[in-house]
Amino acid sequence: MNEFVESMAQVVTGVTVVTVKDERDDVGVTVGTFTSISLDPPLVMVSLDNAGYLNELLLRHDRWAASVLSAGQKTVASRFATAGRPGARLLLAGMPHHRGELSGALIVDGGVTALEAETVKVVPAGDHTLFVAKVLGVDYVDASVLPLSRYRSRYR
């Protein structure tokens, strides 16, 4: 298994923060598996660890947001990747963000893009769950900034 983990560490991935608002708080997590899977209709997919709290929340709440981070947002990525982290509002305190009109979820400003989505299909996949979602709207696109990436277990 360690060989498989090492193999996957060689794959460059974008870094995205996925957020959802539940009855009590805003919750989010840093993910490396977020991608477009269809242009017509516009569909995206995120893969979440079955043991994670966000996985549990997305099984109960269909609408969520994805903020694709820019190269200058390593701190945001690290905050949302830390185990035992507080709610998303505290993690984003002092950082530019806003609430999405379509999902109600927090959106990180200053990334390369952000969108709001609604889950249309849930696919169990080993120790993860794939959430396929229709794009409700693109919140912003900023082609002037470079994306944050993860390669060999480090943000770059």
Give the ranges of each region predicted by the language model.
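Basic, polyanion-binding surface patches
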Residues: 1-156
